[in-house]
């Protein structure tokens, strides 16, 4: 008979629906392990969407808003890796969610790293931008507000050192430059990169925001990401 053991994952629960007032809005945080908060303290609720939710509860104006975390470890915009790619799962994990009105898209580092080393999965900034534009259009076609989050620094990351190449930092910078100027595609920008980078070394996380692998933020880093979200973005109505 198999030995029973306790795990810190769940395999049969994909979401929880709650009854809310008719005017309650819904925010989906759509992303990769930085949205799922890989390497954060277990059960400490330090994901950046957790911090956004806490701030929304405390604000004195605006409609009630629920926050749904659709972060997926290993996720990429363009190609499948750990589960379906962002482009393939967007309908299911965002557009099909009940009550969704706003979306934050923070996705792309795993595209840049190409963990599997397949030549056909080596992507350019232009290819990533095309994918991000498609996500924005699909959300806006459904009447949703959609915001883009910049990609975090990763110089000298030790999580999987094979992913570190000088040209990949150039790709990150090119994507971030486009995001910051993408007023015609997204409805707003959340500059997560600027919130957690080391000003003296902009291609690195600030040490206090680094979990230790120079890629995933610490609890303080994830909370800082949540503080970087301008809540006034959610007060506009189409």
Named regions from a protein language model:
Residues 26-31, 35, 65-71, 101-106, ...:
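Structural recognition of the beta-strand scaffold that forms the well-ordered cores
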Residues 34-80, 104:
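Beta-propeller domains
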Residues 42-47, 81-85, 122-129, 166-173, ...:
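Soluble non-cytosolic domains of exported or imported proteins
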Residues 1-30, 35-44, 61, 234-238:
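N-terminal secretory targeting modules
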Residues 87, 113-115, 151-238:
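Catalytic His-Asp segment of secreted/periplasmic serine-dependent ester chemistry enzymes
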Residues 110-114, 119-132, 140, 147, ...:
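C-terminal soluble interaction/assembly domains
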Residues 11, 49-56, 82-98, 130-134:
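Alpha-helical scaffolding within the catalytic cores
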Residues 36, 40, 72-127:
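Oxyanion-hole/transition-state-stabilizing segment in secreted/luminal serine hydrolases
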């Amino acid at each position: 008979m198999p030995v029973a053991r306790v795990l810190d994952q769940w395999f049969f629960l994909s979401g929880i629906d709650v009854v809310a007032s008719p005017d309650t809005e819904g925010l989906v945080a759509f992303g990769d392990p930085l949205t799922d908060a890989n390497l954060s303290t277990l059960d400490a609720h330090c994901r950046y969407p957790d911090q956004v939710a806490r701030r929304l509860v405390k604000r004195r104006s605006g409609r009630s808003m629920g926050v749904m975390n659709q972060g997926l470890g290993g996720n990429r915009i363009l190609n499948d890796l750990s589960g379906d790619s962002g482009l393939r799962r967007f309908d299911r994990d965002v557009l099909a969610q009940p009550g969704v009105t706003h979306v934050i898209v923070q996705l792309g580092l795993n595209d840049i790293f190409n963990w599997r080393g397949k030549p056909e999965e080596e992507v350019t900034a232009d290819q990533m931008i095309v994918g991000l534009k498609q996500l924005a259009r699909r959300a806006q076609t459904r009447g949703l507000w959609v915001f883009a989050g910049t990609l975090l620094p990763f110089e000298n990351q030790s999580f999987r050192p094979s992913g570190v190449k000088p040209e990949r930092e150039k790709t990150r910078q090119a994507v971030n430059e486009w995001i910051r100027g993408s007023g015609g595609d997204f409805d707003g920008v959340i500059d997560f990169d600027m919130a957690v980078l080391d000003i003296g070394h902009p291609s690195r996380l600030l040490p206090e925001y680094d979990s230790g692998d120079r890629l995933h933020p610490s609890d303080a880093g994830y909370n800082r990401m949540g503080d970087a979200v301008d809540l006034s973005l959610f007060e506009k109505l189409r």
